[in-house]
């Protein structure tokens, strides 16, 4: 069993924001496993389930807003009894250039409030797929920046990163994590 979480904020107004690239990527990955999301209030999320080669896949989009993502993660993790090494979190990263991807296990939260929430509840020894959204170019507040929509040009670059993750996601399912990591460079 594997838990794949995309971080973002619920609501139409956030749908295409930089902070929601985790949701966007997760939806793209889930689509290839022919599943759809439904709201599960007891888990504080939208959830989709599928199987691949006998392995159950649970896709989760927390509906708690970014800063409380851990509430949803612990609810699903506990219900399904999923160990940390089978948890993958996809999220935006302002410290990475737009479209760059990094895969890592454990580590700090880099000031990301969604990760802070998760780390505070389950610890930090889970896998992260970090998708670069870049930093604001001027004196724009970081919170405003990540809560703004991508420009059309930026969205094309973001989609290319999402496609790269989706196209290679099978490597994660096959537990070829180092190979997945090398393909993200």
Swiss-Prot record:
One of its GO terms (cellular component) is cytoplasm. Disulfide bonds: none annotated. It is an enzyme of class 3 (hydrolase). Pfam families: Pept_tRNA_hydro (PF01195). It catalyses: an N-acyl-L-alpha-aminoacyl-tRNA + H2O = an N-acyl-L-amino acid + a tRNA + H(+). TRNA binds at residues 14, 65, 67, 113. Keywords: Cytoplasm, Hydrolase, RNA-binding, tRNA-binding. GO terms for molecular function: peptidyl-tRNA hydrolase activity; tRNA binding. Transmembrane segments: none annotated. The record marks 9 as: Discriminates between blocked and unblocked aminoacyl-tRNA. InterPro entries: Pept_tRNA_hydro (IPR001328), Pept_tRNA_hydro_CS (IPR018171), Pept_tRNA_hydro_sf (IPR036416). The record marks 92 as: Stabilizes the basic form of H active site to accept a proton. The active site is at residue 19. Its main location: cytoplasm. Its EC number is 3.1.1.29. Gene3D superfamilies: Peptidyl-tRNA hydrolase. One of its GO terms (biological process) is protein quality control for misfolded or incompletely synthesized proteins. It is found in: Cytoplasm. Hydrolyzes ribosome-free peptidyl-tRNAs (with 1 or more amino acids incorporated), which drop off the ribosome during protein synthesis, or as a result of ribosome stalling. Belongs to the PTH family. Monomer. This is Peptidyl-tRNA hydrolase.
């Amino acid at each position: 069993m594997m838990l794949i979480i995309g971080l973002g904020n619920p609501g139409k107004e956030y749908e295409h924001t930089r902070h929601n690239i985790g949701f966007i990527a997760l939806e793209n990955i889930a689509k290839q496993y022919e599943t759809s999301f439904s709201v599960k209030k007891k888990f504080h999320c939208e959830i989709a389930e599928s199987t691949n080669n006998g392995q159950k896949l649970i896709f989760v989009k927390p509906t708690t807003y970014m800063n409380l993502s851990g509430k949803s993660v612990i609810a699903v993790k506990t219900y399904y009894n999923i160990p940390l090494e089978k948890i993958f979190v996809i999220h935006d990263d302002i410290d990475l250039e737009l479209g760059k991807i990094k895969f890592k296990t454990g580590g700090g939260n880099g000031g990301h409030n969604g990760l802070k929430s998760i780390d505070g509840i389950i610890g930090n020894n889970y896998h992260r797929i970090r998708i670069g959204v870049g930093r604001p170019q001027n004196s724009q507040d970081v919170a405003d920046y990540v809560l703004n929509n991508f420009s059309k040009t930026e969205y094309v670059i973001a989609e290319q990163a999402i496609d790269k993750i989706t196209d290679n996601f099978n490597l994660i399912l096959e537990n070829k994590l180092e190979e997945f990591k090398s393909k993200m460079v």
